[in-house]
């Protein structure tokens, strides 16, 4: 039998940051409209758009807002998770928030690049991905990185010819 969902007991205070990524995102969809949509989602207390979220100024904005709005979750709707997730986890951690209480929505590659000839569809998808990230971050719990000792011994059975 599965355990019940562990929903945070503290009030959710989610901040959403929608990046323009220069014209990579803003050239196809209006990030401000995505931010305005995000502001209507449950638990979101602050939503804004920013020119380059990954730049020092964008990271500073996130760090300041975590303190200013007492945010306990952050969503960044921007570009590649693979490239920028460590950047935003670091910024969130520097602001005193557990870095695992941050989620990203890749609206550049998955929306504006993939649907550049369908701005209306790209905008709808960007809103959907942002809403999904907000829903996911609502259920995230703080995690800690741990180190596990590695044994330098191994036994290989059936290693082949």
Spans of model-derived segments:
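Residues forming the flavin
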Residues: 1-161
């Amino acid at each position: 039998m599965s355990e019940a969902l562990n929903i945070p007991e503290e009030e959710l205070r989610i901040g959403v940051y929608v990046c323009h990524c220069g014209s990579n995102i803003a050239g196809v969809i209006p990030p401000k409209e995505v931010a305005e949509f995000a502001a209507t989602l449950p638990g979101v207390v602050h939503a804004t758009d920013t020119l380059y979220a990954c730049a020092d100024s964008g990271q500073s904005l996130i760090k300041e807002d975590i303190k200013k709005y007492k945010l306990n979750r952050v969503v960044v709707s921007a570009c590649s998770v693979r490239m920028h997730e460590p950047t935003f986890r670091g910024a969130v951690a520097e602001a005193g928030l557990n870095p695992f209480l941050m989620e990203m929505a890749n609206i550049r590659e998955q929306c504006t690049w993939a649907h550049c000839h369908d701005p209306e569809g790209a905008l709808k998808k960007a809103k959907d991905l942002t809403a999904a990230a907000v829903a996911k971050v609502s259920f995230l719990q703080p995690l800690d990185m741990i180190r596990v000792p590695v044994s330098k011994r191994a036994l290989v059975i059936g290693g082949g010819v």
